[in-house]
């Protein structure tokens, strides 16, 4: 990539660089107060303080956002906003530069792909009625990740990090303008050997991830046309299999020997063409995009032991049995009983392409915006099996074909089409601003399935193809009132939805009341929110761990969610030019089922009215305190505490997740105007808590105490 940067620097004359704004849905921190609802902007300066590569940690600075750690690196995040289902972030609208980024936002929204956080320039989060413009999921909100923008003048950056467990991260970009043309080349490489050990057999548990991005822009007067291309690859030795509670108590950073062959292979490419400009009194942004993504997660599916050892075959059942005290189940996990282990290629190809535009204009007291999106996406599966033999001494054989009947299962092709539009009118009446919004969604899907066990997808199941469709219209309004130059009241209501196929959409009525205060170097926001679900819906996934078929939808009935969000920041000026920035984020949440039911353990299990919604903590707190000196030395200490939650509504033994926390430290020194060096320590106290019991009901701990050092060169 160094050669590419050199070529770019030859083409563009070097100058001091400032960056051109990318496509955003909010803008700057100052633009948040213009929202008819709650929102947050985390700037590039915010992200630079900790140099995080885990989106979970970045979002800890945003109230109302919850997360469930899985691999310790944030490779496949689980994010919830204001109580939405957390599994694979499927109920949050995810975007990069304003374009939907989930592998297949309608067909399969689960975020097995998530943009590489280390290359992201800034982050926007929308909640409340403000999110009605950013479907398809509008109950909780939307997250927009802003990629590195093209600099106005020629400039670049080179970042190099080294850390424990063989961690190496390289991030470099260069770009600029020459006449009407601008361009940017960016490379991000990140790898580590991982922090978990594999019992009996050893091996790495890390990843190797690479992104290459190119942008080009042509500008003429008030018009610009931007081409963006991205290619990404990932290989990660990650497993779905967590630990039984007994194993966790002995060594929380262990992987079972049977997971030796577990590996995720990802690759994909993205391309978008975006027009932005003014035509008369109209501001127009229009984008055409095409995203292709492939992933094959080869991982333990079953331990074929029912006849020999009397334990159900599914790995989720084995862990559950071990948690229930079954000695044979624990022995299988420990590699002390001989079993045949079956692994499945969770092999999927995704497409996501479409066109969208937004037109804005002002007429008197009205600021009108109209948006439209027409898109199609798909998910194609072909899932083959392979097997190996685990001996009673914990030694694994080589992989071999499982034989007849294990060629493949759940092989399918799902293709969806969707159109949506929204209309928004912001009416300004002096200190009062009222925003009224309307959104409409129309979507349909065709699904084909092939018979299990066939070597190729040649024998179409007699029950297919099947066609499913749905539509939904929603309205919302928000209002802001400026009490004075420093204080603003906010109120809003909106009907939210999440598209579902084969059943009615998930719907909820949502309201919020808030207060914003800003004066000098102090800011404070307090919001109360409430979501009344008519029907909480969830689609079965492999990561969820229920006894259900992947893709089936389960109705959780009425659910009540309410809470309080607080965020504040201030800068205290000290002596000798030293300042002390302090930030606080707090969320208190009550999310409970309103009805009692039992789905025979397929997804929700046994639910009693008043049970908590899984993985929504009762509270979350993030406190950041730092210092900035006049000689270029700065530092930040971050303490994040997540309250207790449960992995299931019934919250039985070994299904609780107690309150847990971590502390991160970052020290930075500017050697001159162009060179910074820094040091970071994650999980400073090396806490070893249960932070999740998924995927597959297994207990998981947070990343251990880990140190890294790095430098950043601006040129």
Segments predicted by a language model, with ranges:
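C-terminal beta-signal and adjacent terminal beta-strands/loops
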Residues: 534, 641-648, 665-715
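Extracytoplasmic beta-strand/coil segments of soluble accessory domains associated
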Residues: 60-99
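Gram-negative outer-membrane beta-barrel transporters
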Residues: 362-365, 428-434, 443, 553-649, ...
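Transmembrane beta-barrel wall of Gram-negative outer-membrane proteins
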Residues: 155-157, 162-191, 200-239, 263-274, ...
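Structural signature of Gram-negative outer-membrane beta-barrels, strongest in the C-terminal barrel
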Residues: 350, 362-377, 403-533, 573, ...
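Membrane-embedded beta-barrel scaffold of Gram-negative outer-membrane proteins
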Residues: 274-278, 283-301, 482-492, 507-597, ...
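N-terminal periplasmic "start-of-domain" segments of outer-membrane beta-barrel proteins
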Residues: 20-50, 75-78
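Short acidic/polar hinge/loop motifs at secondary-structure boundaries
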Residues: 99-127
């Amino acid at each position: 990539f160094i050669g590419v940067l050199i070529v770019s620097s030859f083409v563009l004359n070097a100058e001091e660089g400032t960056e051109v704004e990318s496509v955003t849905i909010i803008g700057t921190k100052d633009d948040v107060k213009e929202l008819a609802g709650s929102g947050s902007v985390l700037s590039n300066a915010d992200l630079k303080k900790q140099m995080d590569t885990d989106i979970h940690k970045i979002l800890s600075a945003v109230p109302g956002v919850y997360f469930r750690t899985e691999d310790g690196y944030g490779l496949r995040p689980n994010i919830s906003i204001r109580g939405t289902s957390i599994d694979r972030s499927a109920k949050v609208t995810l975007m990069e530069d304003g374009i939907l980024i989930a592998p297949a936002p309608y067909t399969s929204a689960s975020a097995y792909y998530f943009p590489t956080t280390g290359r992201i320039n800034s982050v926007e989060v929308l909640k409340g009625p403000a999110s009605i413009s950013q479907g398809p999921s509008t109950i909780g909100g939307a997250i927009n990740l802003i990629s590195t923008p093209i600099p106005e003048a020629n400039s670049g950056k080179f970042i190099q990090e080294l850390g424990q467990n063989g961690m190496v991260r390289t991030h470099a970009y260069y770009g600029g303008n020459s006449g009407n043309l601008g361009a940017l080349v960016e490379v991000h490489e990140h790898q580590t050997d991982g922090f978990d050990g594999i019992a009996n057999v050893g091996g790495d548990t890390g990843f190797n991830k690479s992104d290459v991005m190119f942008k080009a822009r042509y500008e003429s007067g008030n018009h610009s046309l931007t081409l963006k291309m991205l290619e990404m690859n990932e290989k990660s030795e990650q497993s779905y299999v967590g630990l039984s509670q007994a194993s966790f108590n002995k060594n929380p950073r262990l992987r079972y020997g049977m997971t030796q062959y577990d590996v995720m292979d990802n690759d994909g490419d993205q391309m978008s063409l975006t027009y932005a400009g003014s035509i008369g009194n109209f501001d127009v942004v229009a984008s055409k995009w095409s995203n292709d993504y492939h992933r094959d997660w080869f991982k333990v599916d079953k331990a074929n032991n029912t006849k020999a050892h009397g334990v159900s075959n599914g790995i989720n059942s084995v862990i559950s049995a071990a948690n229930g005290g079954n000695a044979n189940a624990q022995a299988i996990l420990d590699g002390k009983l001989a079993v045949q282990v079956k692994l499945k290629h969770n092999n999927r190809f995704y497409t996501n392409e479409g066109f969208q535009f937004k037109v804005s204009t002002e007429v008197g007291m009205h600021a009108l915006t109209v948006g439209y999106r027409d898109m199609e996406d798909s998910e194609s599966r072909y899932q083959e099996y392979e097997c190996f033999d685990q001996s009673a001494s914990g030694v694994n054989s080589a992989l071999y074909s499982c034989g007849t009947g294990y060629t493949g299962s759940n092989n399918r092709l799902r293709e969806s089409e969707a159109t949506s539009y929204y209309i928004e009118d912001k009416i300004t009446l002096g200190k009062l601003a009222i925003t009224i919004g309307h959104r409409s969604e129309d979507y349909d899907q065709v699904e084909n399935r092939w018979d299990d066990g066939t070597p190729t997808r040649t024998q179409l199941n007699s029950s297919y193809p099947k066609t499913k469709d749905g539509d939904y219209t929603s309205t919302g309004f928000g209002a802001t009132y400026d009490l004075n130059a420093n204080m603003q009241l906010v109120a809003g209501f909106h009907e939210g939805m999440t598209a579902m196929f084969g059943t009615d959409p998930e719907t909820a009525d949502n309201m919020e009341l808030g207060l914003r205060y800003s004066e000098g170097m102090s800011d404070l926001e307090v919001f109360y929110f409430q979501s009344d679900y008519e029907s909480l819906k969830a689609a079965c996934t492999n990561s969820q761990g229920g006894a259900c078929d992947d893709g089936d939808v389960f109705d959780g009935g009425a659910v009540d969610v309410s809470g309080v969000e607080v965020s504040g920041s201030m800068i205290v000026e000290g002596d000798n030019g030293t300042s002390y920035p302090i930030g606080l984020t707090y969320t208190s949440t009550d999310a409970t089922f309103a009805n009692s039911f039992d789905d025979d353990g397929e997804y929700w299990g046994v639910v009693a009215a008043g049970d908590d919604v899984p993985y929504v903590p009762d509270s979350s707190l993030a406190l950041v305190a730092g210092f900035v000196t006049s000689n270029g030395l700065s530092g930040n200490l971050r303490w994040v505490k997540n309250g207790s939650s449960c992995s299931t509504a019934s919250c039985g033994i070994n299904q609780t997740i107690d309150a847990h926390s971590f502390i991160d430290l970052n020290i930075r020194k500017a050697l001159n105007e162009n060179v910074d060096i820094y040091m970071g320590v994650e999980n400073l106290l090396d806490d070893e808590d249960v932070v999740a019991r998924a995927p597959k009901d297994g207990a998981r701990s947070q990343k251990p105490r880990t140190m890294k050092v790095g430098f950043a060169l601006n040129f």
